[in-house]
Regions:
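Long, intrinsically disordered low-complexity tandem-repeat regions
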Residues: 252, 258, 262, 274-275, ...
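Leucine-rich solenoid repeat scaffolds
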Residues: 530-563
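N-terminal Skp1-binding subsegment of the F-box domain
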Residues: 2-38
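The feature encodes a structural signal of leucine-rich repeats
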Residues: 162-164, 185-187, 208-210, 231-233, ...
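Conserved hydrophobic beta-strand positions in leucine-rich repeat
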Residues: 175-177, 198-200, 221-223, 244-246, ...
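Leucine-rich repeat
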Residues: 168-169, 191-194, 213-217, 236-240, ...
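LRR N-terminal entry segment and analogous cap-like coil->beta motifs
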Residues: 43-48, 57-199
Length: 563
């Protein structure tokens, strides 16, 4: 027999394909199938691999289909398409045999045409998924273990599912199908008509049946960690849906019918491939949480401003270059995450977010902040690390509830004196800027506990720093300090003091008053001696003095720290 070079898989007679499939599923049968072995290296198997990909992902290019198929079956990229097809067969047969052993003992009779071909691949896969679903339904064990049932072929068992659900599952309200190996959701799921919560996360779903829209009582639908490339328009029929979780899928767009989910409160879409949102997103009048982290959004529709109940909006790790002015209409918004985008400015309307408590803008390209930022009267956490800010507006001092302010890795050369008005501030991070001095007003931050000033260009500290009576951590490493003010000894709560890589030639005796100090870092300075008062630091655990020209260390200190 000559190798096949162009015949489609569907047209292969069962007599020809059967030995190939048997050989793939049961390697020991290779010995009796040598006469067919040449087919395994022909165009048959690679062609079958491509067509199986179309079964799972009907739309999209070949590369997308192959990518999804490889993820479903966890195939090694280094395998050829023919080898991948064989691996798919083997896994499918193994699973099918575990579900309905009588169906796949490989005692096939050619004349009965009982063969696993591409023509019936979709229906065969459906019956595997039917049995996977069935095994998660309560009360199924006794029925499936009946002699007359368990020896039926897989297809015959699968055909019984609908009737069994109609008879036994009317009152099921919660169904957990997570991590059971589903490659698609059997349409019989719609027969569980009272279902309120459905969890089908951590499977290999590439699509949802249109029948999903018939679950009229469904309130929570969790589909995280699948391979979904699209949603059916029927999703909009879930009129009672309150929570929809679609994290970690392959979605590139949302159907406009998403706007029909009038009761939806929480929508999770992080780690997909969305490039835009439909304008109908603005119709979700009850939405409180919208998570779009780690997508490919380049802009937001102006209709986003219609989400009048929205409290949490997560947009980290997208490609946003600007925000629409309408974002200021989100009057109930409390949390706004915009880290790792490409924002160069914020709209002035940002100041209208009167309920905002957390604003995170790390790793953008902001060069300035609008003065309206001072209107955020409820703001408690403001994150601006890794931007290009050269100054702060004086209105920053109006943030009377601010507790944490992060400004590391910017280009700040000074701070406005209004910074001292932040009476609730507990954390101030200014490391890796270009500060040459600190204002005396820094001492007004009476609640400050953590102050990070490392990697700046400070040559001195104001005496007012001693007024920071609640300060616990003070990082000043990698500056140009030559001395410390004696007032540093007044920081009675200080536990960590990092002064590595400065130009200190001496320490004030008042350092011995830091009664709670535990860590003192003084590496790479110009110290020639230490004040004896260091010996009074009864809580000190770590003292680092490397790379100093020390000549005189009190014996008590030397013994205590094994110097």
């Amino acid at each position: 027999m000559h190798p096949i070079s162009s015949a489609s898989i569907e047209s292969l007679p069962n007599e020809l394909l059967l030995p190939i499939l048997e050989a793939c599923a049961v390697p020991s049968l290779f010995s009796v199938c040598k006469r067919w072995h040449h087919l395994l290296g022909s165009e048959v198997m690679p062609s079958l691999y491509k067509q199986i990909g179309k079964v799972h992902v009907s739309q999209g290019d070949i590369n997308k289909q192959a990518f999804i198929l490889d993820r479903i079956y966890k195939l090694d990229d280094r395998l050829s398409e023919g080898e991948k097809a064989k691996a798919i067969f083997k896994e499918a047969f193994t699973l099918a045999k575990s579900l309905a052993p009588a169906e796949l003992e490989f005692k096939w009779k050619t004349q009965e045409k009982r063969c696993f071909t591409l023509a019936n691949y979709a229906s065969y896969l459906l019956n595997i998924n039917r049995l996977l679903l069935w095994k998660k339904l309560p009360g199924r064990g006794e029925y499936l273990n009946q002699e007359k049932i368990k020896y039926l072929p897989l297809e015959k068992q699968g055909e019984l599912l609908r009737g069994w659900i109609e008879e036994n599952c009317k009152n099921i309200t919660i169904l957990d199908l997570s991590g059971v190996g589903l490659t698609y959701l059997p349409p019989e799921i719609c027969q569980v008509s009272q279902l309120q919560e459905l969890n089908s996360s951590q499977n290999q779903l590439t699509s949802l049946p249109t029948e999903i829209g018939q679950l009229s009582e469904l309130q929570d639908l969790s589909l995280n960690q699948n391979q979904l490339t699209s949603l059916p328009v029927e999703i909009g029929q879930l009129s009672q849906l309150q929570t929809l979780e679609l994290n970690r899928n392959q979605l590139t767009s949302l159907p406009i019918e998403i706007g029909q989910l009038s009761q939806l409160q929480d929508l999770f879409l992080n780690q997909n491939q969305l490039t835009s949102l439909p304008i109908e997103i603005g119709q979700l009048s009850q939405l409180q949480t919208l998570d779009l982290n780690q997508n490919q959004l380049t802009s937001l529709p102006t209709e986003i401003g219609q989400l009048s109940r929205l409290r949490v909006l997560c947009l980290n790790q997208n490609q946003l270059t600007s925000l629409p002015a309408e974002i200021g209409r989100l009057s109930q918004l409390q949390v706004l995450y915009l880290n790792q985008n490409q924002l160069t400015a914020l709209p002035t309307e940002i100041g209208q977010l009167s309920q905002l408590r957390t604003l995170s803008l790390n790793q953008n390209q902001l060069t300035h902040l609008p003065v309206e930022i001072g209107q955020l009267s409820q703001l408690q956490w403001l994150y601006l690390n890794q931007n290009q800010l050269t100054s702060l507006p004086i209105e920053i001092g109006q943030l009377s509830q601010l507790q944490e302010l992060y400004l590391s890795q910017n280009q700040l050369t000074s701070l406005p004196i209004e910074i001292g008005q932040l009476s609730q501030l507990r954390t101030l991070s200014l490391n890796q800027n270009q500060l040459t001095h600190l204002l005396a007003e820094i001492g007004q931050l009476s609640q400050l506990q953590w102050l990070y000033l490392n990697q700046n260009q400070l040559t001195s500290l104001p005496a007012e720093i001693g007024q920071l009576s609640q300060l616990q951590w003070l990082y000043l490493n990698q500056n140009q300090l030559t001395s410390l003010p004696g007032e540093i000894g007044k920081m009675s709560r200080l536990r960590r003091l990092n002064l590595n890589q400065n130009q200190l030639t001496n320490l004030p005796a008042e350092i011995g008053q830091l009664s709670e100090l535990q860590w003192l870092y003084l590496n790479q300075n110009q110290l020639t001696s230490l004040p004896g008062e260091i010996g009074q630091l009864s809580q000190l655990i770590i003292l680092k003095l490397a790379e100093n020209p020390l000549k005189d260390i009190a014996e008590k200190i030397r013994q205590r720290f094994q110097l």
